[in-house]
Amino acid sequence: AYPPVLGVDQEGGYVSHLRGIATEFPAFDAAGVAISADGRSGREVVRQAAYATGLELRDLGFTWVFAPVADVTIGAADPTIGTRSASEDPAVAAKATAAAVRGFEAAGVVSTAKHFPGHGAATSDSHDTLPVLE
């Protein structure tokens, strides 16, 4: 028998739907800061945070997490992705995303990296309107 597929949006930061139930980790931009400061140990910190999150999710019955955000941000003009992205630098964002996915996987949780490439360049919130990227 297979366990039920139960997913949750638990990125850290303000997209944490288990507030008060699970450990509150910072937004994913902290992962980029850690990796930029020290690549090897930064990636391990990111992996361990995702692993800890994954273990808590498994304990709560979740088998799937909608995280991490793999897209890059354009910074303050980006109302949707912003601090949910590890970095404006694609290489840093890729390293952070890979480390997080490995951590979730090690905890036995399926990870969905999101959002569509380029979403971080949108200047309107996709929850409110259809962004147009040029």
Question: Predicted segment positions?
Answer:
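Enzymes and membrane/adaptor proteins characterized by extended Gly/Ser/Thr/Asp/Glu-rich
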Residues: A1-A93, H115, G120-E134
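Alpha-helix-loop-beta-strand connector modules within alpha/beta enzyme cores
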Residues: Y2, S87-V110
